[in-house]
């Protein structure tokens, strides 16, 4: 969190992608936890965008009803402000993935996504985007181009080192603001060489 605050203080950070090299690394849980931490003060409006259109899970995790969201915004021109809901008592806002009928990857490559992201970042103090894993899909890369920074979530003892290296290479060192080691006590020695990457 301190790293994010430093970047924010320098005016370099307002929007984030949270992704992982492989599935089941805990990126969605990290996304929700980060949104909660950033919203704790109550003075900033935090939006979590569920951009995993392939396997949306946040509604079920939060125990709320699934409703139209990002997919419908991109596919049918739905006003995002009509789909965003406040998550109480966590004090942050959510734009669900929705249930669009089109190809998920193609939707994230549409020309309307940059304008949508610009609108959201001008409305909210923080915009956190939970995307699918970096490989084998290109979804995370499509969204990463439109945000200020990326946080990469690794599952200690599970995420293969070669896949981590590949994900970092695809995202680029200038885009990755940090690595989050999920399920680890301290920095796992297997991944220590990546600590200075960003």
Residue ranges and their predicted role:
Residues 1-198:
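P-loop NTP-binding module
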């Amino acid at each position: 969190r301190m790293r994010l605050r430093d970047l924010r203080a320098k005016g370099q950070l307002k929007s984030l992608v949270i992704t992982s090299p492989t599935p089941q690394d805990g990126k969605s849980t990290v996304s929700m936890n980060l949104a909660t931490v950033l919203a704790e003060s109550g003075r900033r409006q935090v939006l979590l965008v569920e951009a995993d259109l392939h396997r949306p899970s946040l509604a079920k995790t939060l125990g709320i009803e699934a409703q139209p969201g990002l997919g419908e915004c991109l596919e049918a021109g739905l006003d995002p402000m009509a789909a965003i809901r406040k998550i109480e008592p966590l004090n942050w806002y959510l734009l669900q993935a929705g249930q669009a009928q089109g190809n998920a990857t193609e939707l994230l490559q549409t020309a309307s996504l940059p304008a949508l992201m610009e609108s959201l970042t001008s409305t909210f103090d923080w915009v956190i985007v939970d995307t699918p894993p970096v490989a084998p899909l290109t979804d995370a890369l499509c969204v990463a181009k439109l945000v200020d920074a990326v946080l990469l979530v690794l599952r200690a003892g599970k995420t293969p080192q070669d896949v981590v290296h590949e994900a970092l290479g695809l995202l680029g060192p200038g885009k990755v603001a940090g690595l989050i080691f999920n399920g680890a006590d301290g920095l796992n020695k297997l991944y220590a060489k990546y600590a200075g990457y960003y």
